[in-house]
């Protein structure tokens, strides 16, 4: 037997069979686990993660170095407004399509009317960028689930045919009628008309939750015979589920970071107020001590002045008393000497 061809992984360049590589980027299983496709924390666009600590894409990393931490966009609320109050995606869409309108899914004022060409991709709905991505992801899942349902029907019909072929050797006449009925029923299941397929596609869009509940019952049959298309579809659905979980984790991390920033700002404000209050208290104590010192010095000077004035007053009183006595002596002497 000829050896099967090996193909190189685009990340580690090691060679693997074609069935073991992913359909899109041709990555091996280890590289898909080590470098998953995640969404950027800021712009929410998908990129291949180089390390577990890297949660933003290269473009946002360059913008962070150049412009600093972004702010939430005033339209879509995505934390990607590096310049001004709007992100680059909303700025370009506003220039091209005009003012934003209300999204039919999230009810935010962040959906841009892309006319018939853009609405045709989302069944005529007016959706914002994030809701459009989630809607397309649901469509992709329903298509993959339809393929898995079709393959499971074909596998079940082929297994039933083999069992009836074994039974055909014993009961030929009975099997002839039974095989005719089974083949006609199988033809009805496998060959649907275009109108029926379109109706099934629309029904799968409307009841995607019911289809998602039915598909886990068919998974063991799919896993028994993996091929490049089936394994890639399973990997894509698993990656999309992991991406949704990572989006939720990223949103929770953003909320935690915003709350931490808010808490730090409040702590900083409290520290500044405490510092200002301490400075005011120190200034008040300094002024109070100065005023007390000044008041004590003034009281001391006042007491000294009063004491000096009292002493001077006593001396003056003594002088007045002495002068009054001298006048009396003078008057009495003049009276005695007169004839």
From Swiss-Prot:
N-acetylalanine modifications at: 2
What are the GO MF terms of this UniProt record? RNA binding
User: Which GO cellular component terms, listed alphabetically, does the Swiss-Prot or TrEMBL entry include?
Assistant: nuclear speck
Which residue intervals make up region (Disordered)? 144-243
**Bias (Basic and acidic residues):** 215-224
Subcellular locations according to the entry: Nucleus speckle
Residue ranges under compositional bias (Polar residues)?
Answer: 228-243
**Does this entry carry the keyword Nucleus?**
yes
Cited Pfam families: FAM76 (PF16046)
Record keywords: Acetylation, Coiled coil, Nucleus, Phosphoprotein, RNA-binding
The coiled-coil segments of this chain are 248-328
Which residues are recorded as modified (Phosphoserine)?
22, 148, 193
Q: InterPro entries, alphabetically?
A: FAM76
Q: Which residues carry this modification: Phosphothreonine?
A: 215
Basic residues biased stretches: 167-189
Q: Name one GO biological process term.
A: negative regulation of inflammatory response
Which stretches does UniProt call biased (Low complexity)? Answer: 148-160
Q: State what the entry records as the consequence of deleting this gene.
A: Enlarged spleen with white pulp hypertrophy. Increased population of CD11b+ myeloid cells and decreased population of CD19+ B cells with no changes in CD3+ T cells. Enhanced macrophage- and microglia-mediated inflammation.
Q: What does this protein do?
A: Negatively regulates the NF-kappa-B-mediated inflammatory pathway by preventing the translocation of HNRNPA2B1 from the nucleus to the cytoplasm. Inhibits the PI3K/Akt/NF-kappa-B pathway-mediated polarization of M1 macrophages by binding to and stabilizing PIK3CD mRNA, resulting in increased levels of PIK3CD protein and increased levels of phosphorylated downstream target AKT which leads to decreased NF-kappa-B signaling.
Family classification: Belongs to the FAM76 family.
What does the record's free text say on domains? The basic polyhistidine region acts as a targeting signal to nuclear speckles.
Quaternary arrangement and interactors, per the entry? Interacts with HNRNPA2B1 (via C-terminus); the interaction results in retention of HNRNPA2B1 in the nucleus and inhibition of the NF-kappa-B-mediated inflammatory pathway.
The name this protein carries in UniProt is Protein FAM76B
Q: Which gene encodes it?
A: Fam76b
């Amino acid at each position: 037997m000829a050896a099967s061809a090996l193909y190189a992984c685009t990340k580690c360049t090691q060679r693997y069979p074609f069935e073991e590589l992913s359909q899109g980027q041709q990555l091996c299983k280890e590289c898909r686990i080590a470098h998953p496709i995640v969404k950027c924390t800021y712009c929410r666009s998908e990129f291949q993660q180089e390390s577990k600590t890297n949660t933003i894409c290269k473009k946002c990393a360059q913008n962070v170095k150049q412009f600093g931490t972004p702010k939430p966009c005033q339209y879509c609320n995505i934390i990607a407004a590096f310049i001004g109050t709007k992100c680059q995606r909303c700025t370009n869409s506003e220039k091209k399509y005009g003012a934003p309108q209300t999204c039919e899914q999230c009810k935010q004022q962040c959906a841009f009317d892309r006319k018939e060409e853009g609405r045709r991709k989302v069944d005529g709905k007016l959706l914002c960028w994030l809701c459009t991505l989630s809607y397309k992801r649901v469509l992709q899942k329903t298509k993959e689930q339809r393929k898995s349902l079709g393959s499971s029907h074909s596998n079940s019909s082929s297994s039933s045919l083999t069992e009836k072929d074994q039974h055909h050797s014993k009961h030929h006449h009975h099997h002839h009628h039974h095989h005719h009925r089974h083949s006609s029923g199988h033809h009805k299941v496998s060959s649907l008309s275009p109108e029926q397929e379109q109706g099934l596609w629309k029904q799968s869009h409307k009841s995607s939750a019911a289809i998602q509940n039915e598909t886990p019952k068919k998974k063991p049959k799919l896993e028994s015979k993996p091929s490049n298309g089936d394994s890639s579809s399973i990997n894509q659905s698993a990656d999309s589920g992991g991406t949704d979980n990572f989006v939720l984790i990223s949103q929770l991390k953003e909320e935690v970071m915003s709350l931490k920033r808010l808490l730090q700002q409040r702590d900083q404000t409290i520290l500044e107020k405490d510092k200002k209050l301490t400075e005011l208290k120190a200034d008040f104590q300094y002024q109070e001590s100065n005023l007390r010192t000044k008041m004590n010095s003034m009281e001391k000077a006042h007491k000294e002045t009063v004491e000096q004035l009292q002493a001077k007053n006593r001396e003056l009183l003594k002088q007045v008393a002495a002068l009054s006595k001298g006048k009396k002596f003078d008057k009495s002497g003049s009276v005695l000497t007169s004839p």
